[in-house]
Amino acid sequence: IGDHRLSDAELLALLRSTQEPAPAEAGSPAIDKGVECLIQVIDVLVGLQELNSASFRGSSHRAVHLAGAVAERMDLLPTEKLEIVLATLLKDIGNAGVSEALFEDVGTFSSDKHEMMKQHVSASVGLLEHIDFNWKVLPIIRHHHERYDGTGYPDGFKGPEIPVGARILA
């Protein structure tokens, strides 16, 4: 894992392995190309976001590997796996709106800085909520910092209240 960044081919292969073809147009080149383009755009956005942050560089791709492995082990449906992979890539896109100085801190955040950091969840959802995803990506993104015991954020969900994909990411 370390500094390993998925190549475009590796990322596309992982996402294609989770893709469930549309019943009416199974194998349609247009659908496959559309999903492939979406993945490439997401990969560019994630790469731009992580470009200037040594602490975050490659973290989304490492998280994709781990979340994908857990989803595979849980034998989730292909659509659920795709949702988890997409949410994993997009979950921290709202960090673009958080002060860069905050990311320079090493160790535990003060409570004020922790409150500032929490804003990335609503920022991520805010940036993405106008997109009519064909998958349940936003609930996973919104709840990826919830904790099974209810001590997480933003809503303090616990146990089965937390979407499965968000539980995997948390």
Residues of each region from the PLM?
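Histidine- and acidic-residue-rich, metal-dependent catalytic cores
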Residues: 1-170
